[in-house]
Amino acid sequence: MATNVKKVKKLRPKNVTVGIAHIHSSHQNTIISFTDKQGNVISWASSGSVGFKGTKKKTAYAATLATAAAAQKAREHGIREVIVELKGTGQGKEAARKQIITSGLNILLTKDVTPVPHNGTRPPRKWFKRQEKR
């Protein structure tokens, strides 16, 4: 009987020296993706893909491990310098930025692109109650 053989794609270096590090840090997870200037994803990782589950995904430690994993893959593809775009209000935002520095990538620019409504629609009721407690 024949067995199914799984084909493994060989990593081909993309030879991109300058990229963009998108860090999306929500209240429950942190997602890091490295792209080139056009927005094509080179590598990515999240707190869940590194192995954390449940409430541990939102911690700063989980964000640092996810950033280290994504940065390692990005370095294999040739990225040496990054522009960091931070989005969200989670715990892992600053921890992920610091981990990019310690992983050996040079930061050219840091931008905070968190969307802020300028008197848009009324927020959901659950969000409204959370603001009253503060």
Swiss-Prot record:
It comes from Mesomycoplasma hyopneumoniae (strain J / ATCC 25934 / NCTC 10110) (Mycoplasma hyopneumoniae). Part of the 30S ribosomal subunit. Interacts with proteins S7 and S18. Binds to IF-3. Keywords: Ribonucleoprotein, Ribosomal protein, RNA-binding, rRNA-binding. SUPFAM superfamilies: Translational machinery components (SSF53137). It comes from the Bacteria. GO terms for biological process: translation. This is Small ribosomal subunit protein uS11. Coiled coil: none annotated.
